[in-house]
UniProtKB/Swiss-Prot annotation:
Protein name per Swiss-Prot or TrEMBL: Steroid transmembrane transporter SLC22A24
One GO cellular component term noted in the UniProt record for this chain: plasma membrane
Catalytic activity: estrone 3-sulfate(out) + glutarate(in) = estrone 3-sulfate(in) + glutarate(out); 17beta-estradiol 17-O-(beta-D-glucuronate)(out) + glutarate(in) = 17beta-estradiol 17-O-(beta-D-glucuronate)(in) + glutarate(out); taurocholate(out) + glutarate(in) = taurocholate(in) + glutarate(out); 5alpha-androstane-3alpha,17beta-diol 3-O-(beta-D-glucuronate)(out) + glutarate(in) = 5alpha-androstane-3alpha,17beta-diol 3-O-(beta-D-glucuronate)(in) + glutarate(out)
Lineage, broadest ranks: Eukaryota, Metazoa, Chordata, Craniata, Vertebrata
Keyword Kinase: no
Gene that encodes the chain: SLC22A24
Protein family (similarity comment): Belongs to the major facilitator (TC 2.A.1) superfamily. Organic cation transporter (TC 2.A.1.19) family.
Location of the protein in the cell: Cell membrane
Main localization of the protein described in the UniProt heading: membrane
InterPro entries noted in UniProt: MFS (IPR011701), MFS_dom (IPR020846), MFS_trans_sf (IPR036259)
Topological category with respect to the lipid bilayer: Multi-pass membrane protein
Amino acid sequence: MGFDVLLDQAGSLGRFQILQIAFFFVTSMITYTHILLENFTAAIPGHRCWVPLLDNHTTSGNDSDILSQDALLRVSIPLDSNLRPEKCRRFIHPQWQLLYLNGTSPSTNEPDTEPCVDGWVYDQSSFSSTIVTKWDLVCEFQSLKSVVQTLFMSGSLLGGLMFGRLSDRYGRKAIYTWCLLQTAIADTCAIFAPTFVVFCIFRFLAGLTTINIMTNAFILATEWTVPKLQYIGITLILCSYSIGQMLLGGLAFAIRDWYTLHLTVSIPLFVLSLLSRRLVESARWLVTTNQLDEGTKALRRVARINGKKSAGEILTIEFVRSAMQEELNKAQTKTSVIHLLRAPKLRMIICFLSFIRLGASVPFMGLILNLQDLGSSIFLFQVLFGAITFISRCSAHLIMKHMDRRINQSLFFFLVGLCILVNTFLSQEMQTLRVVLATLGIGTVSAANATFFVHALELTPTTFRSTTAGINNVFSRMGSVLAPLLMTLVVYSPHLPWVMYGVFPILAGLIVFCLPETRNRPLPNTIQDVENDTKESRKVKEEDTFIKVTQF
């Protein structure tokens, strides 16, 4: 575990780390808005059928000139069960008799209606345009709206596995830059998509890379920081998600047409992809993949940025080889995903991490649906949601400084489950308490996720860190799909879905204790480090590393 010694020589928390985390903060903040875009770009505004009396401005007549808009609407559009104008049907012929006696004139038959064969008219008070208004994704086509987000999440699921392995094989920096560029190109092209199918394809391509931008930011920040400070960078990047949520709410409030909003959050990614070329590749990854010369150059560059001029003389290839001799010997053996599956301890850790990620994602998505009761303004909801998660993630940062990872996660997960289960059996009249509990649940599950990210990265070896992060992302996406499916259980009991939402985090909180504790411990670099790891072996390795350093 000698890399932390090298990092101390180059600077474990200096100018380089601050600039790196600041860059990741900005990129993650902008990238996270792309995940939530459909909240606004695919919003369904109020709508009704297009009818000649109201919407054909070339038509004029005594009746249409004299009568009010409400009266013309009454004779053209039938009412639904809530006595509101139907959104998907219109009268074949104007029903003038409905204007008399409050619409109760004698009628032997119900007036004939038809679908909106001439299209729809949309309410533009909240959104001047969305993809729904562009391609008329309403009424019998409304199910197509969910296809966009489903394809985006499917892309995230596939991309997590694909780019995770590519990152472990070809490097964090190259994949990070590529993912930024692909997301920028795909979502910019989506604006100019001529058809809905083409738009979906581009959103799928954006989904392939979006999650990996944030995953690689976590990994690079972790691998360039000593263990006792790793939680700082990860927490700050997580907080950027919350800022991104609030930023998107503000931008969507100011920009009401979908294509301008899409373009506004896509253009910065082109600039960021160019700037990302100035990033330094993970020296930890370079050394553990037997690229000793490149790893030494990266360490020297970081030392120079951190103002450690004398470190350039110390950080020689011989010094790096001496400090990392054990890891270099292990790196001589080529590894693949098969080796990961054959390692019993690491395999068990990945299984536990995957279920915990699933257990965090299910209640998170379930609570999002319930939080809509906070208000009717989607813009206010987005900002409020971001503020809640920001506060909780900052709190998690402070708690991680003083509490073990397992206890930290477990307490948060138990609190999430308790909030949901109590909320499940409260009466609908206790609206204020229900909202408070739902808000507390969102905050605690966000805090649990913050600790999970730190713990997961500290448990997995450098040679497979991106791969295992990709596997965790797959289970996160599975949780996003499972949460709405659980809501179908409401046909058996209105409480059953919410009981399930509450049980998942409690189980996750219990499973956390099956994982090793990692607070203030060196990162594992190889599969062998994980397999042979015990408290005693770690102490021995740390003592060996100390002896190596004192010899120079």
